[in-house]
Every structure is written in C-alpha cells, then in structure tokens.
Amino acid sequence: MDATYVGAYGRLKVYEVDFLKKDFLEHLISLDKPSDFSSVLYASVYKEDYDALTSIYREPDLTEMAINRHLVRMNRIAAFAIPPLAKNALTAYISKWDIENIKTVISSKFLGHGLKETEMFIVSFRDIPMGLIGGVLTNEDYRNMMNLPNVEAIINYLTRYGYGSYMLQFIEDYRKTGDISPMLYSLDRYYYARLLESLKYYNGDEGPVINYIRSDIDRINLNTILKGKKLNISYERFFSGLVDGGNIPINAIHDFYGNSDILSMIDSIKRYYDLEDAKNKYASDGNLYHFDVSMRNIMITKYMGTMSMLPLSLDSIFYFIIRAEIERQNLRTIYEAKLHGAPKESIYDLMINGVV
C-alpha cells in the first residue's frame, strides 16, 4: 500500500455511495415508457446533470446527454483525486473517450452526417469533453473537426496530436479503397499500446488493472474475428486491426479464425474464456453481442472485486472509473430499449453485472 493514495481513496469512497444500486436498475427495467425512465433517473443523483442541460436539450436527447455528463463528472472526481505519480496511467486510460469521439466524428463525416446528428454521441460535447480531463482534445477541437469538409481534413487536423500522425500511415489505403476501418482500428492499437506503457508497476499491486486491460484487448480482438467470420471476410482483410498486448497471442487468434464457423471458434477459445452461455444464446438468435456482454461480465467478475479490496493503490481509482463506465453502459442499454420498445426480458441479456 502507498500512503500517497490515502487522500484519493477517502475522496472516492465518499462518492461511491452515488453509484446506482442493482434494485434501482431493475426498477428502471420494469418501467414501461422512456418518459418514466427519465423521471425516475432525474429523481436520483443525476438531477444535477439534467438541470445543467435542460435549457439546451429536449427528450430523448436530454437523458442521453445527462448520462454522458454524469460519466464525465465521475471521471473528473477520480482525475482530481489521483496522486501525481499515477496521473499518467489515468490520463492514458481516460483518453479512450478521445478515441471513441474521434471514431464517431470520422464515421459521421464518412456517412455525411452533420453537427446535430453527431454531437449526441460525443462524450461530452456541450459540457466538458472527456479528453480535456486528460489534457488532450478540447471542446473547440471537436467543433472544429465536425465542421471540416471531409475525413482527410479531420486526419490532418489530428496530426497536431499523436492520433493523427499515427493514422496517416493508412491514408493512402483509404484513398484507394474508401474504407475507413483500418484508420479506426489503428486508433485502438495506439490507445492500448500507450495505456500498457503507462501502467508500469509502481507498487507491484497494479496487477489487477493490467490484467483487466489485457482482457479488454482480448475482448476487442475476439469481437473483430467474430464479426469477420460472420461476414465471411478473409483474415488478411482485418489482421491489421488486431491489437497486441492481450492474454491471447495474435498467432492463437489466427488459429481460432481457422475454424469453420463461429460455434467451433468459441469452443477453441474455451481454454482462455468460457463463453458457453453466450454460444447457446447466439445459436438461438444469431446475435454476436452476447459474446461481448459475456466477455465484459467475465472481466468484471474476475478483476473488479480484487480492485475494490486494494484500497491504497491505483486499483481503487480504476475500480471507481470502470464502475462509472459500467453504470453509463447499463443506463444507455435500458434507455435505448425503452425508446425502441424492446421486451423487458431481453434487456437482462445486455446488462453488465457483478459490481452492484
């Protein structure tokens, strides 16, 4: 344990009571209408977020943005609580939202979507962009990028940061093929390489965080090959999109892809991850999301409990910010289901469990 984490741990413990409990989420699932969801969420710790945005947005956008804003607020709490020696690790982790936002902006520009259509998916556009906490992209940067004429202009804009320079190596392929996926994949590789480099052993007790990140890389890679197999794409087409640094070696990923179908691929992965339940659900309805949800739940169950039990360490801070992410994802899942009239029973298959 490190005494420099004492203040951080104390501050975060105060705010942990703000996390929504399992029975609250189940109550949200039981509601019939999106407006009921919004009313109940407004009456919780999310009231501040609604009030800050109510003059700018109307439903259903207001609830989406309030959920995003709350995540930013929780991450700010963690960012300002962290000891100086741990700042690089947290900054590298939080930059994931820069990555997601950049992907959103590039994809929207590629599809011809405008500013209004894009800002709903930026975390967070009108209030405080997540990258600002990490000292990278600002609110103005996102506005500027969304107003640029095309994808290449966005890449050139990003060259002032590390992201754009890394993506430039794929610009010629984009010009030839019109395919933006290699550039988007490159952002994942850039992010995880930088993150793993930042997570050097400081006290020797950051193992759970590192293992969680390695498992997340496995999740990304498994999602990639499962989509590839579903679409019958050759391995060479997406090999450049695989991320190094996971628990599963890249050559093993290649071997998995050699299986004839998705079900046999999942069987061969079993020595790393038991996805049998997700496999059965996929066999029933053909939806790949079961595997992603199962991977996330495995990671949460395996590592989050340990992180929470190492109070004076980097683990306790990562526990806080990962828990905030899970809450956001679960709330968005429930709300989207309400907006689209999905059966209540189906929502449970999409929920990330294990921490509430």
From Swiss-Prot:
Entry's Gene Ontology molecular function annotations: ATP binding; proton-transporting ATP synthase activity, rotational mechanism; proton-transporting ATPase activity, rotational mechanism
Main subcellular location of this protein, as a coarse class: membrane
By its UniProt entry, which HAMAP family does this protein fall under?
ATP_synth_C_arch (MF_00314)
- Name its species: Thermoplasma volcanium (strain ATCC 51530 / DSM 4299 / JCM 9571 / NBRC 15438 / GSS1)
| Pfam families in alphabetical order | vATP-synt_AC39 (PF01992)
Q: What is this protein called?
A: A-type ATP synthase subunit C
The entry sums up its family as follows: Belongs to the V-ATPase V0D/AC39 subunit family.
Can you supply one Gene Ontology CC term for this chain's record? proton-transporting V-type ATPase, V0 domain
Which InterPro entries does the UniProt record give? ATPase_csu/dsu_sf (IPR036079), ATPase_V0-cplx_csu (IPR014272), ATPase_V0-cplx_csu/dsu (IPR002843), V-ATPase_V0D/AC39_subunit (IPR050873), V-type_ATPase_csu/dsu (IPR035067), V-type_ATPase_csu/dsu_dom_3 (IPR044911)
Q: How does it assemble?
A: Has multiple subunits with at least A(3), B(3), C, D, E, F, H, I and proteolipid K(x).
Its signal peptide is none
Kindly give the PANTHER family that the UniProt entry links to this protein.
V-TYPE ATP SYNTHASE SUBUNIT C
The task this protein performs is described as: Component of the A-type ATP synthase that produces ATP from ADP in the presence of a proton gradient across the membrane.
Gene Ontology terms describing biological process: proton motive force-driven plasma membrane ATP synthesis
Q: Which Gene3D superfamilies match?
A: ATP synthase (C/AC39) subunit, domain 3, V-type ATP synthase subunit C domain
